[in-house]
Amino acid sequence: MILLRASEVRQLLHNKFVVILGDSVHRAVYKDLVLLLQKDRLLTPGQLRARGELNFEQDELVDGGQRGHMHNGLNYREVREFRSDHHLVRFYFLTRVYSDYLQTILKELQSGEHAPDLVIMNSCLWDISRYGPNSWRSYLENLENLFQCLGQVLPESCLLVWNTAMPVGEEVTGGFLPPKLRRQKATFLKNEVVKANFHSATEARKHNFDVLDLHFHFRHARENLHWDGVHWNGRVHRCLSQLLLAHVADAWGVELPHRHPVGEWIKKKKPGPRVEGPPQANRNHPALPLSPPLPSPTYRPLLGFPPQRLPLLPLLSPQPPPPILHHQGMPRFPQGPPDACFSSDHTFQSDQFYCHSDVPSSAHAGFFVEDNFMVGPQLPMPFFPTPRYQRPAPVVHRGFGRYRPRGPYTPWGQRPRPSKRRAPANPEPRPQ
């Protein structure tokens, strides 16, 4: 997996409006993206535990949270927003996948000054555990209503990525479960999440929306769960952000930097103690490759953003350096020194992060995730193609057929794939 730096993430999301909807796990997804837009650092345990705070890394609490009454009820609200000169990221806390509140959010987005370019969404745990004996039937009906509504409200240029719910632990004590329900619900919640993911992913693909199977990617990473069995540590959330960004880059036809994967993120290991802590893209834009990598994170960014007085500029791509010839019988090794991109409460080098797989995802050329996970330092490894007979089905699903590259190491460099979402017969006029 290519690990993007903060400067590259700022370039990828330049002049983009990103909306994230979901529960407390997706609040951490929002926080990690906001942090990554500014710094090459990981979220601290304190930042992951905090909820409803007035400010986080230059963002603002717009509604709910500590501005109101903090509780774990079904009507809890929290709206956060991060805004810079060239980025807008907004988070809405959801306790149900489709509701009157969700319809209000969609109307707000539809009537806003800017239409969203990217929507990242999931809702599962609250839906299947907090709404009584008919929770399952309601969840299935709400999923169908949700994707029908999204197909009518979101513009065709907007990329919606439905994330499957992350795995949960053997024991679940998260705050979304009232104490009297924890013992009853925790015994079967783990399997119910798998079942819910199947139905939600099927419904999303049925309406031609993208699906990113986070449950698959992190199914062997439970040693990185918080003690409550629901939330995850900062390293997992950074890996999650990289998966999302790679998926988005592929859908938008953006070519990621050509450099060796940096460190092995996740690999199989014996169970250990839990870590404590709390392509529907815009079809009119050609594929633009990101700039080549920098030799050190202390150098200037890939693309200097224009000052506020100048108009916004699109992504630019300098001429790549001349290729280096390799002998046909030798594997290709990374060029240049390894990067040290991150700093946090834990000091480590970037070669601690590497995501390797025998299962290349068809949606991402040269993008891999190993099916056995762990966090730990590993030595750099050469690239060897995987025989075709060892390649099972991809785990990043699209709602429609995709162009497949000839091999797992072929860069995309293609135009964004056209959307098969049909525009509504009688679309409602956008409010002025």
Curated annotation (Swiss-Prot):
Quick one: where's region Disordered? Answer: 264-293, 398-432
Q: Which InterPro entries match?
A: SGNH_hydro_sf
Database matches in PANTHER family: PC-ESTERASE DOMAIN-CONTAINING PROTEIN 1B (PTHR14469:SF1), SARCOMA ANTIGEN NY-SAR-23 (PTHR14469)
- What family does the entry list? Belongs to the PC-esterase family.
| UniProt protein name | PC-esterase domain-containing protein 1B
